[in-house]
Amino acid sequence: MLVSPTDAREPSHARLHRRRRRGIAKMRDLLESTAPMPRFQRHPFSAYCLGLLLATLALCATWYLQGRAIVLPDAAGPTHKLQCASYSPFGKDQSPFDQPFTLRPAQMDADLALLATRFTCVRTYSMSGLEGIPELARKHGLKLILGAWINAIPADSEREVQKLIAAANAYPDVVQAVIVGNETLLRQEVTSKYLDGLLARVKSQVRQPVSYAEVWEYWLKHPQLAGGVDFITLHLLPYWDNQPSGIDGALEHVADIRRRFDQAFPGKAILIGETGWPSEGRQRQTALPSRVNEARYIRDFVRLAEEHGWRYNLIEAFDQPWKRRIEGAVGGYWGLFDADRQDKNVLAGPVSNQPDWPRWLALSLALWGAALLLGGRPARARDALLQPLAAALGAACVGLWGAQAQVICTFLDEWLWAAYLVLLNLLVLAHLSLALGAGAGWRARLLAWLETRGGWWLLASGFAGAVWMLALVFDARYRNFPNAALLFPALVYLCRPATAPRREAGLLALLIAAGIVPQLVLEELGNRQALIWAGIALLLAGALWRGLRQERCVAAAASAPAA
């Protein structure tokens, strides 16, 4: 019997053990070749059709559930006007930080005409550039609560106060109250003693009631301020509280705070100067922004306020895109109307969280179809069901991320980051579609190109995940969760490992995994978006770890001596 050099060097028991393993492997292959195939493998065309049907239904259901209209009781009848709404005169392409800032009188005129159909008054926050607003308010039959913006620069505050006094005295029939300062103590820009002096000065020079506006916690910290105002203006924003209230408990929280103020300041008139709910943005604990939740909160609050005879001002009239830079995406979406002055159906009528859902569904279906065409015929019978479903998941994630990016992106850097993640998902979708396809001709060449760079797509996903995880751990307040952007790459490279450089993959996996528990502690377990992100981060860390292991296996195989 001929014995190979390798067999000659091995002990007899080792050769026997190796031959036994070979025999077991051959037997397993024989059994698999003769075992009855599952029905879907015997009929790959049927499995493919089933996959197409399931994927189509899944895509349609995803976007329908996002955008279906919800019917809620209206805030008031069409002829019943509400009390007051906050108004800032900025268009969707304007910001108070633009200097020199130029107001658009025609836009302000149209804005007040629109607000006059639903409200009896508007509240403003600054006098700079708004000297003409009392005349416009008179034109449209609106009353004003005029505000002077007080900050840390005494000269700026002095100009604001002088203009406020002049406008209040020039338009006593329009200006029903004045507010000196807005959350100035919260921003720690002035002292309560300084505010007392300003309030006393304004009270001595105008006939209207004078107030100061602050979040409710700071009124309780500085109760002495109540002695210097004619009425208390408190801000009740359950979303922004240090302990946010979910939509189910928000109104109970508001009513409780309002009762506490009646007890803390007996006999003092109270205006709820700001209350509302955001329609877009990141979840804070159990407080979830959405159009439906905004409509639900506003409508229920108005009924509650009318029942109790509360004075109130809703925040705010129009969405303010410029606020996204300083308050995150959520800051720009407190309006009753959007930045284009279109009704969001917050006050009346059916309301949808995603009114454009048919457009996003069409985009997802088109991308899904393109992925199937790119992949071509499934490579194996078992892929016939998987290919349409996997492509649908990728198309849905791209669509959901696109819809989210449209909401959270305002500035160039944000759009570039969003585009980076869209491109990454498209590359991963192309990679998977081709890998599940038969792969002949140009498809085989393209798959080979993508396959050799699969580790880079994995590292690009890990880089995005690590950056976002660090942001959510160390600067989370205004950060959105990138769930739709990273779910697909994480799943693909967890199930189908890509060889990634050991050092980089290990570092990224460590950063992502190490941040999971801290961000959950910060967000608490009631935050569904945070829980989903933690799951995706775990998948992504696992994908990076598998990529690292794959690289070790490849390196070991390359260094092993030939038999």
Residues covered by each model-derived region:
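N-terminal carbohydrate-binding/catalytic regions of secreted carbohydrate-active enzymes
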Residues: 87-148, 152, 156-157
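Aromatic- and acid-rich polysaccharide-binding/catalytic face
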Residues: 146, 176, 214-252, 277-278
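Aromatic-lined carbohydrate-recognition surfaces of secreted/lumenal glycan-active proteins
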Residues: 206-220, 268-273, 311-319
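Active-site clefts of carbohydrate-active enzymes
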Residues: 237-244, 266-294
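Substrate-binding cleft of secreted/luminal carbohydrate-active enzymes
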Residues: 288-347
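Alpha-helical transmembrane segments of integral membrane proteins
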Residues: 380-563
